[in-house]
């Protein structure tokens, strides 16, 4: 079920090395002198944003489909956090450094990066802490190495991604100033204790001539189950 979208992602990786597309999809890092993926470049100018748009257009025309989760769609969230480094450092001085290091690593390695946003809905009339304790993602322990988390998230493309930026979509913690459910972190998708439960794919169930996009560009949704997963500081 993963082959269609994995083939597309592989094609995007290959395009960056081909003379016909390399100029639109890569840039030379001013510090290291290395050629990196332009989609993950930290934007600082109008020209940076226009270059990203040109790269997206180039990819979409080549692969012949609108694919939204091919590894860089959540990079913008990292850039927003980078802009708020001073605020993050007020919470914990390590957080600002973590964001800067993550942006650098993703840009250099062209990491397949997705989000882990959507929560199992459960009973929406209740606060997170009043529901099934193992359903919504939350911290169960804090150690010198990091936090241990348990619960679930839904995310498209997680099963074939390198990592996910996991964060809450619920903002009501009741009277609590701090909540074990208010979590944001980067997690490798092969972390110990993390399980992937995927829906079936659309490819092969219908005539490709009648349903060309679902056969060629199906992005698989996954239920991520965190079973006491350690998230390092």
Where does each model-flagged region fall?
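N-terminal-proximal low-complexity accessory segments that begin disordered
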Residues: 1-20
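Terminal targeting/low-complexity segments that flank the catalytic cores of oxidoreductases
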Residues: 4-10, 32, 36, 223
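Alpha-helix initiation and N-capping motif
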Residues: 6, 75, 96-100, 133, ...
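Arginine residue identity/basic-tract feature
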Residues: 9-11, 53, 69, 94, ...
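Internal helix-loop-helix
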Residues: 17-113, 158
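Gly/Pro-rich turn-and-neighbor structural signature
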Residues: 82-150
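FAD-binding core of flavoproteins
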Residues: 120, 124-233
């Amino acid at each position: 079920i993963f082959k269609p979208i994995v083939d597309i992602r592989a094609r995007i990786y290959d395009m960056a090395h081909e003379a016909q597309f390399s100029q639109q999809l890569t840039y030379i890092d001013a510090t290291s002198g290395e050629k990196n993926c332009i989609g993950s470049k930290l934007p600082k100018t109008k020209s940076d944003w226009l270059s990203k748009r040109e790269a997206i257009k180039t990819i979409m025309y080549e692969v012949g489909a609108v694919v939204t989760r091919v590894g860089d769609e959540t990079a913008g969230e990292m850039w927003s956090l980078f802009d708020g480094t001073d605020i993050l450092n007020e919470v914990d001085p390590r957080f600002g450094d973590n964001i800067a290091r993550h942006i650098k690593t993703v840009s250099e390695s062209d990491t397949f990066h997705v989000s882990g946003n959507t929560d199992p809905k459960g009973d929406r009339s209740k606060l997170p802490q009043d529901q099934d304790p193992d359903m919504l993602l939350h911290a169960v322990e804090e150690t010198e190495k990091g936090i241990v988390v348990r619960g679930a998230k839904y995310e498209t493309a997680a099963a074939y991604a390198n990592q996910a930026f996991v964060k809450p979509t619920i903002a009501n913690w009741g009277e609590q100033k701090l909540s074990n459910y208010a979590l944001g972190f980067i997690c490798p998708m092969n972390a110990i204790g993390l399980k992937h439960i995927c829906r079936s794919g659309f490819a092969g169930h219908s005539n490709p001539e009648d349903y060309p996009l679902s056969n060629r560009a199906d992005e698989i949704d996954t239920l991520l189950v965190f079973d006491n997963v350690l998230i390092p500081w």
